[in-house]
Design a protein with these regions (language model features):
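Extracellular mucin-like PTS domains
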Residues: 35-67
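Bacterial N-terminal signal peptides that target proteins for export
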Residues: 2-13
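Hydrophobic helical h-region of N-terminal Sec-dependent signal peptides
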Residues: 14-18
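Core segments of small alpha/beta cavity-forming domains
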Residues: 74-158
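C-terminal motif of bacterial Sec signal peptides marking the signal peptidase cleavage site
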Residues: 20-24
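Structured, amphipathic secondary-structure segments that form assembly/contact surfaces
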Residues: 119-242
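Bacterial signal peptide processing site
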Residues: 26-29
Length: 242
């Protein structure tokens, strides 16, 4: 039996809070400030394991990906697989992997938008399109913390956090509270998070040294209605392999 367990996970906004703390230490990017909070998401992810609570489906599953205009800034879209992922088949696996990578790409885009001061699309209704239910309260707390920190920090950041070497490190089957399960419904996506282009309001690099890049892992959960959602991020280590 294989079980996923993500301890000491950080939402994207926790990374912003950490960055704000680092940049506020008299210009010392290696300051000792810590994120205001972290979220912990534990998920049993095998066909025979018990599951933590998830939201019940509110709409019927749709195998087709939503057709929407390319989102920008803090805009949030629902992410579904482009093919039916209910079957245990190669095409379903590839569709789930692609959906999980889209979740991570959206997470990175939202992180940059929030760092730039764009909080337009942060209502509960909009966040629910993207955030795993157990992670919602933490994301909301971190958004408010980021609002406060940006105000106290003298303005928003410029530049973007970038991603590279994106790959799926685990693909598991999640058993839902009603006893049903879907293959490829719990995924972990690992990548290199690069902060080297991010600048503070005064134009200085926000993070320098070994902490300017980090290897992180994002948990992605498929809900019963077919949506793939962000369920938390954990930092594996400072620096990246490449």
């Amino acid at each position: 039996m294989k079980t996923t367990k993500h301890c000491n996970t950080l939402t994207a906004l926790s990374a912003v809070t950490l960055l704000l703390g680092l940049s506020a230490c008299a210009g010392d990017a290696q300051g000792s400030s810590q994120p205001s909070a972290s979220s912990t998401t534990s998920a049993s992810a095998s066909a025979s394991s018990s599951a933590s609570p998830v939201a019940s489906a509110t709409s019927s599953a749709s195998p087709a990906a939503s057709v929407v205009a390319e989102p920008k800034g803090s805009e949030i879209i629902e992410i579904r697989a482009a093919d039916d992922t209910n079957a245990d088949a190669a095409i379903a696996k590839e569709a789930a992997i692609a959906a999980a990578k889209r979740v991570v790409a959206q997470d990175n885009r939202l992180l940059n938008a929030w760092m730039h001061g764009d909080f337009e699309h942060t209502s509960d209704e909009e966040l629910a399109k993207y955030v795993y239910p157990d992670t919602m309260s933490q994301v909301k707390e971190d958004i408010q913390s980021a609002r406060n920190d940006l105000k106290n920090n003298g303005g928003s950041f410029t530049g973007n956090v970038t991603m590279r070497d994106v790959g799926v490190s685990d693909i598991l089957t999640y058993k839902y509270p009603d006893g049903s399960s879907h293959p490829y419904s719990a995924l972990r996506v690992k990548y290199c998070m690069d902060w080297t282009q991010v600048r503070t309001p005064d134009g200085e690099r926000a993070v320098t040294g070994p902490d300017s890049t980090a290897t992180v892992e994002v948990s992605v959960m498929r809900l019963q209605d077919g949506r793939y959602t962000y369920a938390g991020t954990r930092q594996i280590n400072s620096g990246c392999a490449s």
